[in-house]
Amino acid sequence: MTTFKSKGYEGRIELVHNPLAKWEGVWGIQASQQKLDVTGEEATLAPNETQKYSLFGVEHRQFGDFHVELGTRLDHQKVDVDSEQKDFDGNAFSYSGAVNWDFKPNYKLSLVGSHQERLPLAQELYAHGGHFATNTYELGNDGLDNEKSNNVELGLHYDDDKLSYHVHLYHNWFDNYIYAKTLDQYENFRLIEYSQDKAKFYGTEAEVAYQFNDIYKTSLFGDYVRGKIDSDNAPRVPAGRLGTRINADFDDHWSGSAEYSHVFNQDKFAAYEHETQGYNMVNIGLAYKYSLADRQEAKVFFNANNLLDEQVYEHSSFLSNIPQMGRNFVIGVDYKF
């Protein structure tokens, strides 16, 4: 038996300023503290405490048909660990810029560029031991540096009363991508170490939707991502997907949905991985929503998932050899107050 004891605090203060030279924005500070103590047969982490302090800001302004947004964030993180491994103390600086161009009625073209820095997590720094939930033996790396990436994303949007669509293309370049690298494998049990290497990820995501009438709306969607670490395939990268969905709002209370998607084979796999077969997924749902007093709301729902009872394997999982849930049914209640 393993016991996880986590105690943490988090606070955030934001200041929204009046327009300055037509720039509007918000600045703020954020602070958090977390103590983690893991005991038992799966105690993969020594007791540790993470303190993090952040300063952030976002500014935006309209220039005719162009909307410009700038953002920045400065993080300081300290991780104290109760072991012979060295403590972590570091800073990260991120910034971004975005331009949205309303070049025609109902159309918008967007371009986003950013430099992102991520501080390593305690798990990535200090893990040491068997983690049977992922069927791995994990080795942390207290020599990890900040993960740094330069990113660009291009998007096209269209939206009117009936038809809407969007397409996004993105590319991310990493100087020192942090990932769980498999060093060895016995049957399906892996020895992994948190490592850093140059990497790049690029892909696309798109959706087109059509509102037939006040009740029915249908959409087509798809996404694809490709990951490379140095010249090799990145591990646990999900396969491409295409699908269609129909939503129905029958009245103020009843709604329903049906979705079909096809996930392709993933034949671009990393060392110690294997090809993952694709599958077809069919899900349906029905819900009844009603309002209560004082703005409270309740929704009773029924979902039927994987109606084809497909053998589903997720390449992005550490347990990609274990099938996901087959045909299943869910009944539940959502209550908002």
Language model segments and positions:
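Face-selective signature of the C-terminal outer-membrane beta-barrel domain
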Residues: 1-102, 114, 158, 163-171, ...
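Outer-membrane beta-barrel translocator domains and adjoining extracellular loop/strand segments
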Residues: 1-2, 37-44, 80-88, 123-128, ...
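Residues on the lipid-exposed face of transmembrane beta-strands in outer-membrane beta-barrel proteins
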Residues: 11-17, 55-61, 97-101, 154-158, ...
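Transmembrane beta-strands of outer-membrane beta-barrel proteins
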Residues: 25-29, 68-70, 109-111, 165-167, ...
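Outer-membrane beta-barrel signature, preferentially recognizing the C-terminal barrel domain
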Residues: 87-88, 94-102, 108, 115-166, ...
